[in-house]
Amino acid sequence: MRKICLLITAFVMLAWSSVAFAQNVKVSGVVTDASSGEAVPFASVMVKGSMTGTSTNAEGHYSITVPKDGILVFSFMGYISQEVAVGNKAVINVKLEVDQQQLDETIVVAFGTATKESFTGSASVIKSESIEKMQATSVTRALEGKVAGVQLTTSSGSLSAKPSIIIRGISSISAGSSPLYIVDGVPYDGDLNNINNSDIESMTVLKDAASNALYGARGANGVIMITTKKAKKGQAVVTLDAKVGVNSKAARDYDYIREPGQYYEAYYLSRYNYFVNAQGLSSAAAYQKAASTITQSAKNGGLGYNVYTLPEGENLIGMNGKLNPNATLGRIVDYNGQKYYLYPDDWMKEAYKSSLRQEYNVSVAAGNDKSTFLASFGYLDNNGIIEGENMKRYTARLKADYQAKDWLKVGANMSYTNFTWNNANGSEGSSDTGNIFAFANSIAPIYPLYIRDENGNIMKDEHGLKRYDYGNAANAGLSRPVQSNSNGLQAVTLDKIQTEGNAFAGTGFAEVKFLKDFTFTFNVGVGLDESRTTDISNMWYGQFATDGGTISKAHERQFYYNLQELLSYDKTIAGNHHLNVLLGHENYTRDVYGLSAYKKKLFASNVTELDGAVVDGQNASSSRSSYNNEGYFARAMYDFDSK
């Protein structure tokens, strides 16, 4: 009777799980703009009341598995959210309506402002409330997933990596085409990592040719306009913002082979198929040849390493193509009188870590009918998800304006940044051995990370350093067929790439009103960026060990200035007809100076200057480049009843 009850209970549970599974349906569709019919990429698609969700792709398409009784919530910045009950629908296409409440907002456009309702171009605005919620170092990260038609790509996960931006609808067809950045009305050529997110009031992305026409060829790939905060009239306001968090690897990995046995099986199968199909061997002959060569050296078509212990005379892979059930992971090898223990390590686990991120910002703002004043200070201490990578940044900003006369207004905005970046990732190339992210992801799960003695203990060298397996015969005489003479994880602990520097940016303006409807504005902007990079490759291991280690120094200085003279006529006729005419002239100049030198054969491991190396690399160089742009432009805008 007890067995019957258990059987009935199991049957009921199975039936219940089947019913529950059947209640889930796969829904797909496309999200578009209700007025234009264009796709809305990266729109949020969430199951109401849960954490389940997805986003649309670049073409506005989505696919999600949801309960039949669920409700999907479609949303995107600038649009009214829409809820749709799933029911029995397999396809749900949604047309999002523009949020009309935002149309009266003033947005920053080329050389001026306009209301959203009267603006005829294509632009997206991100406010400070949205920017401050993000734990991002670069202001460009604030655009990620929040602006339709804007795609961000990064070649590595480095803290200092600068995302490439592609704006849909412009001439950009590759990540090499960057948009033009305008900060408080002036072109900005500095490092965007030097701008404190807490200082930003809004970011406007101009996406179409009409919106960017006044910037000429410079705006061909789109324009991103950054407006910094200013004080409001009223009592003094002191703001303190503190953020503490943890950085960790969040992106999911692809489903790839992680087990050593599965990797040997897959490699055996590829060799077996080759011998059968390309060389015409019989199944038995192909098995013998493939099974006997997979752990041999690369020149014999093998992987170079066998990390399994096998009974005498047995193959690692059986006739069925599966790992020998008698194989045990871990193998002791006697080589030149020294016993080594071969055991594969989890390279991903060793490469990544969780680390602390701290950010503190304080600001003081005050204003009255005549003037406003804002001062801010920020500190960021951000540690990366790999060993040896971190950054520190100090920022300060002063911004003020003064209504000297009814017809005269003046103002200034100055910012200073001091930064230090330690970039442990020697390369951002996806296939480079110096890129630890690529190295850890691509190396086969059969290879040891460390060199171990017969007891499994990690061996150390004469300097007290852990011995890493470089795949160059140092570990029991074995070599890797690929990624030989390299170990990205030891490189991040012994090598050093540090960039430190300072950045200053300042703008000023004078605005003169005359003849009631005319305004003349003079804008000036200057910027000075300087950075010093030290790149040290250790003297003991890796490709530069034969040189006794190397050190290179690079110093770059960039100075730019911008002058603008703008004359505008703004008139409202009969209450409904609004006309705005702009005439302008702009001159922009940028000079970049570079100096670099290289030496090798370091005196000691703690060398940080060229004097600490013996041999001159004979490749010291310097450079200078200049760029100048001058333009005259005009614009006329008309709207009726603000439409």
PLM feature segments, named:
Residues 347-352, 483, 489-499, 507, ...:
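Asp/Glu-centered strand-loop micro-motifs enriched in Gly/Pro and often flanked by an aromatic residue
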